[in-house]
Regions:
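Conserved small/polar residues in nucleotide/adenosyl-binding loops
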Residues: 227-232
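A structured beta-alpha segment of the ubiquitous adenosine-cofactor-binding alpha/beta core
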Residues: 68-117, 125-128
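Mid-domain beta-loop-alpha active-site segment that forms a flexible
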Residues: 202-222
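Glycine-rich phosphate-binding loop and adjoining beta1-alpha1-beta2 segment
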Residues: 39-80
């Protein structure tokens, strides 16, 4: 399906770890090369731990630092872009709705016409409770592009949902895999240290593959104005 290539862009990414850490540097570069206003907001409440260094996009100097802040400051500074990040988990609907609210821009100084941002929500938190929250936000949005990625050690999926004029044009992850909406998952902040330690680690290959699928969709939406809506 077609997407506009002349509107300002806002990308909001939930999760700056396994997948988000590899998505971030290339989204920053992609937005930097656009000839229109673009913003990138990275959100994550987690900190960099030693166990993250082998499979996530961090280095020893990042240990103990907030993941969203590390990624946002590192790449926005290098590219001369505004640094925007939220150093906490997004777990409440009003907070998410505020993040994905499109800003209006005056692109022509000689005209009073204002243009709304095209908003992309990237779900890089492999957690079904967060997907349920994003599903709610998606269906309450007048317009939104919601790309969700999820992967295990060897398999995964990336699904792009589209809302336009208050209608669902393409189903999001919750519509494609409705079983995820029934899962009794916990938000990241609700998971204890013991439970987190027992989680099966994802492989770096799966993380990079999922990130690449997300980036292909984002690139095609913003530059080619067309994309396939699922990747497995």
């Amino acid at each position: 399906m077609k997407f506009p290539t002349d509107r300002p862009v806002k990308v909001v990414m939930l999760g700056a770890g396994g997948t988000g850490g590899y998505v971030a540097p290339y989204v920053f570069r992609l937005l930097h090369m656009l000839d229109r206003p673009a913003r990138f907001v990275v959100c994550d409440g987690d900190i960099v731990e030693p166990k993250n260094l082998d499979r996530q996009n961090f280095v020893p100097a990042d240990l103990g630092e907030n993941k969203a802040r590390v990624l946002a400051e590192r790449y926005s500074t290098v590219l001369g872009m505004e640094t925007e990040y939220v150093p906490s988990f997004i777990e409440k609907l009003p907070d998410l709705m505020e993040l994905i609210e499109p800003k209006e821009w005056e692109l022509n100084p000689y005209s009073t016409k204002r243009t709304k941002e095209m908003v992309l929500l990237l779900g890089c938190v492999d957690n079904n409770k967060t997907r349920q929250l994003c599903h709610q936000a998606f269906h309450q949005s007048e317009e939104l592009i919601y790309i969700d990625s999820g992967n295990g050690k060897y398999t995964g999926q990336v699904v792009c949902g589209v809302r336009r004029n208050g209608r669902t044009i393409r189903k999001s992850i919750g519509g494609v895999h409705p079983e995820m909406l029934k899962d009794t998952d916990l938000f990241p902040s609700e998971i204890s240290c013991a439970e987190a330690a027992q989680e099966d680690p994802q492989s770096i290959v799966a993380n990079v593959t999922a990130a690449t699928a997300v980036l292909i969709m984002v690139y095609n939406i913003l530059t080619v104005s067309y994309t396939h809506l699922r990747a497995h």
